[in-house]
Amino acid sequence: MTTLADLRINYSRASLDEADVAPDPFAQFDRWFKEALAAKLPEPNTMTLATVGENGRPSARIVLIKGVDERGFVFFTNYESRKGRDLAAHPYAALLFYWIELERQVRIEGRIEKTSTDESDRYFASRPLGSRIGAWASEQSAVIDSRATLEAREKAVAERYGENPPRPPQWGGYRVVPDAIEFWQGRPSRLHDRLLYTRDAAAAPDWTISRLSP
């Protein structure tokens, strides 16, 4: 019988060398993300978001990246959810993209800022109607007594707003403004390639690339 200790694979698809990466981590992320899309990976925009609450306890969950540019990495959520409360208490976060089919990870750390009202409005308006209604119906992370309660709220919101629900005031975007981005490429014998981009401040233009021991 296979045990947990027996489960392992040997990584051998590719390598990651300093001479081959972009000097800017956003350009390198764009390169890898396009390769994930070309490989037709299921939902390559999924990432783990790690936060820390007011009590010092960490928590993590899967969310979807919805924007990347030189300012940072953007996702949207309910500001009153657990992650929203965590980020209000400690405005720093870590992100992790894991593309196992390509034997790659991207790890991102940085401070958090809310996106502008206009940016949140534009993205909310682009969502499917059901998702916009759901943003009103769900008091994310709050305890509810039954599924029926949630569905009743959904029906009430749909009847109230019809085809044009506005963005709820408690719903919007966050941007992770990174000061560290690590690119990880699996290699044989667990001697993986790890290249870390860092900068002294989140707004600094220049990045330093360091190789980390696996």
Curated annotation (Swiss-Prot):
Residues annotated as transmembrane: none
Function: Catalyzes the oxidation of either pyridoxine 5'-phosphate (PNP) or pyridoxamine 5'-phosphate (PMP) into pyridoxal 5'-phosphate (PLP).
Pfam families the record matches: PNP_phzG_C, PNPOx_N
Taxonomy, superkingdom: Bacteria
Annotated metabolic or biological route of this protein: Cofactor metabolism; pyridoxal 5'-phosphate salvage; pyridoxal 5'-phosphate from pyridoxamine 5'-phosphate: step 1/1; Cofactor metabolism; pyridoxal 5'-phosphate salvage; pyridoxal 5'-phosphate from pyridoxine 5'-phosphate: step 1/1
Positions of FMN binding: 61-66, 76-77, 82-83, 105, 140-141, 184, 194
Coiled-coil ranges (or none): none
Binding sites annotated in the UniProt record for substrate: R8, I9, N10, Y11, K66, Y123, R127, S131, R190, L191, H192
Gene transcribed to yield this protein: pdxH
InterPro entries per record: Pyridox_Oxase, Pyridox_Oxase_CS, Pyridox_Oxase_N, Pyridoxamine_oxidase_dimer_C, Split_barrel_FMN-bd
Family from the record: Belongs to the pyridoxamine 5'-phosphate oxidase family.
EC numbers on record: 1.4.3.5
HAMAP family named among the record's database cross-references: PdxH
Record text on cofactor binding: Binds 1 FMN per subunit.
Gene Ontology BP annotations: pyridoxine biosynthetic process
PANTHER family, per database record: PYRIDOXINE-5'-PHOSPHATE OXIDASE, PYRIDOXINE-5-PHOSPHATE OXIDASE
Cofactor dependence: FMN
Catalysed reactions, semicolon-separated: pyridoxamine 5'-phosphate + O2 + H2O = pyridoxal 5'-phosphate + H2O2 + NH4(+); pyridoxine 5'-phosphate + O2 = pyridoxal 5'-phosphate + H2O2
Protein known as: Pyridoxine/pyridoxamine 5'-phosphate oxidase
Principal EC category: oxidoreductase
Keywords recorded for this protein, A-Z: Flavoprotein, FMN, Oxidoreductase, Pyridoxine biosynthesis
GO molecular function: FMN binding; pyridoxamine phosphate oxidase activity
Subunit structure and binding partners: Homodimer.
